[in-house]
């Protein structure tokens, strides 16, 4: 009695219905509100939940519409990494996710960028950014 408990918010990544593009949008929102979650948990199917039904069936039980559910460990890792994009360990996964979603605009030194390429940290970075943007523009 009388103990004070600290609430620790956490996020669940790879929730059924969440695509990689959705995860990028969430990362932008987290950046905009200045929040970097310390704890992120991958979605784990649990018996009796609508989310689990969506995960296994690929269908939203409320709407009957198809939903995406990340099942591949690498896809799940990219969604998780995006929520903690400032963590240096997630750098490669964040870069890959941004490339897959054609969001090269979030790689660079602008304040809105999720993945910084500051030339002071990496002398090859500026060339890499130019090459990446050129590659993305050719795809469009």
Residue ranges and their predicted role:
Residues 6-20, 41-46:
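Conserved strand-turn element in the central/C-terminal portion of the radical SAM core barrel
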Residues 47-140:
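Radical SAM enzyme core and accessory elements
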């Amino acid at each position: 009695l009388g103990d004070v408990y600290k609430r620790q918010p956490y996020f669940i990544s790879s929730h059924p219905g969440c695509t990689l593009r959705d995860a990028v949008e969430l990362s932008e929102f987290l950046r905009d509100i200045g929040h970097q979650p310390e704890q992120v948990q991958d979605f784990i199917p649990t018996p009796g939940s609508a989310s689990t039904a969506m995960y296994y069936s690929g269908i939203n039980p409320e709407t009957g519409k198809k939903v995406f559910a990340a099942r591949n460990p690498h896809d799940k890792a990219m969604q998780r990494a995006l929520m903690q994009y400032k963590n240096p360990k997630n750098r490669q996964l964040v870069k890959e996710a941004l490339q897959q979603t054609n969001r090269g605009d979030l790689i660079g030194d602008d304040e809105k960028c999720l993945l910084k390429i500051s030339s002071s940290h990496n002398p090859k970075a500026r060339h890499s950014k130019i090459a990446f943007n050129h590659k993305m523009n050719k795809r469009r």
